[in-house]
Structures are given as structure tokens and as C-alpha cells.
Amino acid sequence: VPMYPGGKVETETDASARTFADFIGAKLVSADEHEVVAELSIQPHHWNLARIVHGGVYMSLLDSAMGLLVSLHYPNCPVVTTNLNIHFTEPASEGTLVCRAKFIHRARSTMTVEGRVYLGEDRLCAHATGSFRVLKLPS
């Protein structure tokens, strides 16, 4: 299942095969108006030279899941990331990364989202907050 499967985000299905999240191997586990959960099976191409997951992989997984959460509230409206702040807490080199995104604050055209990436269900590897802007609000 690509990052943007059927359901509320059905209109994103065709485009999902061309997204960066799909390219890196991110898979959607669940998505509703309160939380998005995605996962990524760590492969050697996700590593940096230290043979741990590259920080850009965490950032991409977080940005994709957090952005999808905002997009669920504004179907067919472009959403962009205006800020992404991340803390890397623990390295990972094998296993499955699980990303959970939830709202912190919602306003009319801007939203603040929190995302956490775990190795499995309990080892926190990265924590992020992000601000997102809806470029074209529905009429």
C-alpha cells in the first residue's frame, strides 16, 4: 500500500506512486482525522556512512505522515510544510520504523503537528514538530 491509499485520500492514489514517500518505501498503516501511522522497513540504502538510518530518511517519513494528516482535513487543497524541527534521539540500523503523527494545534489555514518515529513500538528514534499551511482554502 503506498503512502496515500484509498479512503479519504482516494484522490491522491494515482499520484502516490510518484511521491518521495513511496520512493523511500514508506507504507501507510492507518489514517484518520486524529492520527496518521506510517512505517518503513529499514534497508541498507537508508543508511548513512555510519550504517545507521540517515537523518533525511527520518525527516522525510515525518514530513510525509504529518503532511498527510493535515491533507486529510483539506482534501484537494495543496498543503506545504513551512517549518520542521526535529530531534534525533537514538540511532537505528535494522528493523521497522513506525511513525505517528498527531495534531498539536489547528487554525483555519495553518496547523501544528507532532510526529514521533519509533523503532518498533517503543524505542524513540526521532521527535518532530512541524507547521503546515493550506495554500488554497476551500470556498
Identify the function of each model-found stretch.
Residues 1-139:
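Terminal targeting signals and extreme-terminal segments of soluble enzymes
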